[in-house]
Amino acid sequence: MNIDLNADVGEGCASDSELLTLVSSANIACGFHAGDAQTMLTCVREALKNGVAIGAHPSFPDRDNFGRTAMVLPPETVYAQTLYQIGALGAIVQAQGGVMRHVKPHGMLYNQAAKDPHLAQAIAKAVHDYDPSLILVGLAGSELIRAGERHRLVTRQEVFADRGYQADGSLVPRMQPGALIHDEEQALAQTLDMVQAGRVKSVTGVWTTVTAQTVCIHGDGEYALAFARRLRAAFNARNIHVIA
């Protein structure tokens, strides 16, 4: 059995370099919520050195709140902003002799696109128009995955090791109780349930089915490195291969 393990990087965390030795895919911030040209270049070089698949991590234009503010923007604006960010990272990747593999939206852009078909369509179209060979990463079972499929993109359904789930398969909003899982044992058990059994227990105790093709570890999390090591060990013990 194979699973992709991804992390968001280039967001100002000192652990990026070490984290990139543990994951198979990296989502690199493109400047709209965090990062800049130099951090993108540094992360690209580190990812290439470690054989990690490189992806763009576009966001709403919201550096003050780390891309976590809800915004209502015209789909055409989201299309243009997504293209802009993908293109910026793509130029750096190409200049370093690499190949960009995927796109995963960040924060509130990701969450809103999971439920808003018009926003999801704008993102999927931007990815397709830039490079139809790119993989579009989105919340498992979401509108973003469906939009990617309509554009005939390869999609990858994502689950979260350290986030609480609602009964409908969506993530618990960050400001609500149960949104973040701080207990390592609980996060590990949830991840293994999702990967091996295709199910997740919601904060209300309801089990729901989920497709896990890639697991996210938040690089800005306090215990990201320790948990990444623990998760890799758990996968190895169960003959689950971490591969992009």
UniProtKB/Swiss-Prot annotation:
Q: What is its EC number?
A: 3.5.2.9
Q: Name one GO molecular function term.
A: 5-oxoprolinase (ATP-hydrolyzing) activity
What is the protein name for this chain?
5-oxoprolinase subunit A
The record describes its quaternary structure and partners as: Forms a complex composed of PxpA, PxpB and PxpC.
**Classification via InterPro entries:** Glyco_hydro/deAcase_b/a-brl, LamB/YcsF/PxpA-like
Q: Name one Pfam family in it.
A: LamB_YcsF
> What keywords appear on the UniProt entry?
ATP-binding, Hydrolase, Nucleotide-binding
- Asked if Zinc is a keyword of the record, the answer is no
Gene3D superfamilies documented for this protein: Glycoside hydrolase/deacetylase
Q: Its biological function?
A: Catalyzes the cleavage of 5-oxoproline to form L-glutamate coupled to the hydrolysis of ATP to ADP and inorganic phosphate.
What does the record give as the reaction this protein catalyses? 5-oxo-L-proline + ATP + 2 H2O = L-glutamate + ADP + phosphate + H(+)
Q: Which gene encodes it?
A: pxpA
Q: Does the keyword Transferase apply?
A: no
Q: Which family does it belong to?
A: Belongs to the LamB/PxpA family.
Query: Which N-terminal stretch is annotated as signal sequence?
Result: none
Q: Which organism is it from?
A: Salmonella choleraesuis (strain SC-B67)
What's an example GO BP annotation here? carbohydrate metabolic process
Q: EC top class, in one word?
A: hydrolase
Q: Which NCBIfam families match?
A: PRK05406.1-1, PRK05406.1-3, PRK05406.1-4, PRK05406.1-5
